A protein has these predicted regions:
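Conserved N-terminal structural module of periplasmic/extracytoplasmic solute-binding proteins
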Residues: 12, 24-105, 115-120, 169, ...
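C-terminal capping/gating helix-and-loop segments adjacent to ligand/active sites or protein-protein/ligand interfaces
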Residues: 33, 220-221, 342-351, 362-411
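Extracytoplasmic/periplasmic substrate-binding proteins
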Residues: 34, 47, 95-98, 202, ...
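Extracytoplasmic/periplasmic substrate-recognition and gating elements
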Residues: 54-55, 81, 141, 245, ...
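Hinge/lid segment of periplasmic solute-binding proteins
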Residues: 95-152
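Short, solvent-exposed loop/beta-turn-alpha elements that line the ligand-binding surface or hinge
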Residues: 110-125, 212-234, 283-286, 295-303, ...
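Extracytoplasmic/periplasmic solute-binding protein
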Residues: 135-148, 153, 177-224, 240, ...
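Glycine-centered hinge/linker elements that transmit conformational signals in sensory
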Residues: 180-183, 221-252
Length: 411
């Protein structure tokens, strides 16, 4: 090889190496989630991203804030495109994660689950909603998502308003209704409520679970039998009755869950039935009264589950980086951080939790899960149920749908 050939080869190699370095330096890690910025999990995940940046200084991190509704309505389209991120928060359940898993749009994580020690953080109970069969039904099949938190629906209540009238936390449905009536007699609408989004179904399903046993929950969530509508009929009758008595405002049909949360946090309503994702907001914004939570009185089941999951799209360009990020989210430091911000962390060290809200929520979640009382969510069984339940519940509140018509729509 003559000198000119050697020079040409050397120059060519240099160009290739330079291109490779430039490509490595320009690698972009795309991550999405829909948790509101002030929630404990979002704050903790943001800190995990900062740690990620220090561990991967050659990677550009591109975070995008999404909404729950965006991914609920367009998840399949996004995941089935070249615009999918490397990792994203996704809702669990047959109708959401199950649907896209059955379409082959998610990366199986079983190998990473064991290799990276995630099985030491998450037990079988924590991962039952991470597995979906070929039909998209939860409980078996490959692991396609990793939860990093728990969540449940409870009754947020204004301690000051309760104490001013000598009221105790209700322990039965009858006592709960008596509390509603007490406030209404004082001219106060007792329940903050919104039917425009997922808040519509939380109260509805909570009331249905007052009439549910193990068989009903398993049949409903696992599509094991035709729908027994009796618990939903009871729930629909209660909501219609509570609207007629003024326990729920008819104006709720114009409110989102965040609007209803603002009604509670501003002190206008003494109670709000919603999920633990409100804790960060309430801890930061409620300054004029004391507040807490209690589990709605049911025989066993509470609306809730392990939280939303991080999934890795089949089309993700940087899967190893996605796994590294999940490592950080599941780390003891990040889980403790989440708990001490008031979150329901799955892998936190109880001895390390000093935050009052975080400690309460971890304890309540343990109380529910230890008795096998996680009833999941009503929109999970089949795709399209989310929108159907919102429309049908809105009809109950505005009077355009009777309880009997409501349950007919669910079949």
């Amino acid at each position: 090889m003559n000198i000119f050939s050697k020079l040409a080869l050397t120059a060519g190699m240099s160009l290739l190496l330079a291109a490779g370095v430039a490509q490595a330096q320009s690698k972009t890690f795309n991550v999405w989630w829909y948790e509101l910025p002030d929630t404990p999990q979002a704050v903790a995940w943001t800190k995990a991203l900062e740690v990620f940046k220090t561990k991967h200084p050659d990677v550009t991190v591109n975070f995008e804030q999404k909404t729950f509704d965006q991914l609920q309505k367009a998840g399949s389209l996004i995941l089935n495109s070249d615009q999918a991120p490397d990792v994203l928060e996704y809702n669990k359940g047959n109708a959401t994660a199950g649907l896209v898993a059955s379409q082959g749009l998610l990366t199986p994580l079983d190998d990473e689950f064991k290799k990276r020690g995630w099985d030491k953080v998450l037990n079988e109970t924590n991962t039952q909603l991470s597995k979906y069969d070929a039909n998209g039904v939860y409980g078996s099949g490959p692991i396609i998502g990793i939860p990093a938190l728990g969540e449940f629906v409870s009754v947020f209540y204004n301690i000051d308003m309760f104490q001013a009238d000598g009221l105790k936390v209700p322990t039965t449905l009858a006592e709960f209704e008596a509390t509603l009536d007490h406030f209404k007699q004082k001219g106060i609408t007792p329940l903050a409520y919104g039917t425009v989004d997922s808040n519509a179904q939380h109260l509805l399903y909570t009331l249905a679970l007052t009439q549910a046993d193990d068989t009903w929950v398993k049949n409903y969530q696992g599509l094991k039998a035709p729908l027994d509508t009796k618990p939903f009929l009871f729930a629909a009758q209660k909501i219609a009755d509570w609207v007629s008595k003024g326990y729920i405002s008819k104006d709720s049909t114009g409110l989102k869950g965040t609007d209803a949360a603002n009604v509670f946090s501003s002190g206008k309503a003494p109670m709000f039935v919603s999920g633990t994702w409100n804790n960060g907001n309430f801890a930061n914004t409620i300054k004029t009264f004391k507040w807490s939570q209690f589990i709605f009185p049911t025989p066993k089941y509470t609306v809730g589950s392990t939280g939303s999951m991080f999934v890795v799209p089949k089309s993700a360009k940087n899967k190893d980086l996605a796994y590294d990020f999940i490592d950080l989210v599941l780390s003891k430091d990040n889980q403790n951080e989440q708990a001490n911000l008031g979150g329901v962390a799955i892998g936190a060290d109880p001895a390390a939790i000093t935050d009052e809200v975080g400690k309460r929520n971890v304890e309540l979640f343990k109380q529910i899960s230890d008795k096998g009382g996680l009833g999941f969510y009503p929109d999970w069984p089949v795709p399209g149920y989310y929108e159907l339940l919102i429309q049908a519940t809105t009809g109950l509140v505005n009077g355009s749908t009777t309880p009997d018509q409501f349950v007919v729509r669910l079949k």
